[in-house]
Amino acid sequence: AQIVAEELHLDTESIVAALLHDTIEDTTATHEELAKLFSPTVADLVEGVSKLTRIQYATKEDEQMENLRKMLIAMSKDIRVILIKISDRLHNMRTMEYQTPEKQKQKSFETMEIYAPIAHRLGMQKMKWELEDLSLKYLDPVGYREITEALDEKAAEYDGFMSAVHDRIVTRLKEEGIDATVYGRMKHPYSIYRKMYTQNKSLDDVFDLFAFRVIVDTVADCYNVLGIIHDLFKP
């Protein structure tokens, strides 16, 4: 419920439903009782989350896709159902260290195959990145540790580089009279992991460790910025 309230900023009924999301599944409470005590909408949300909880996940690709379709169908009825479910899974992943190794791998696999892709489809990139990173932590602990430790060791160097690039872009845009907001970030561990292990590269051989985003007001400015970026940093 805390994730629903503080990170997704959903409405009151969603927060109440998040607090009650296991009620139908784990107690004798019924949809009718929840509707009477709270509201029909809260009851519908809780019931929707319970239906997703009952989906059985498997390892075969076609079965995973069927699970994905079921969740997408649930989304079409009320998007808040899937938002609550993804928030619940994120909370579970954040506290996964208290589970058995077998449970950790099972839940991490589900998260990587089902929840992270749906978060991506919904444009919830920050949540998607965290779900992927936490899943990697349990699916390949050694690989996760190698990457995070290497990133920690080079944090000061990388921060300095990103700051320099950011300032260079901002300065040039001001010179060109373009009003823009520039954001920079380090790629997250799972993204780097995929590049390293699928292409058999070391961290030093991965050149796209950083991502920058330039927000402008018009399409014309967008194309102007693209030209400026290409001028500053040859593609």
Q: What do the PLM-derived regions correspond to, one by one?
A:
Residues 10-20, 41, 45, 81, ...:
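Alpha-helical scaffolds flanking conserved acidic
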Residues 23, 45, 49-54, 64, ...:
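Transcription initiation cofactors for RNA polymerase, centered on bacterial
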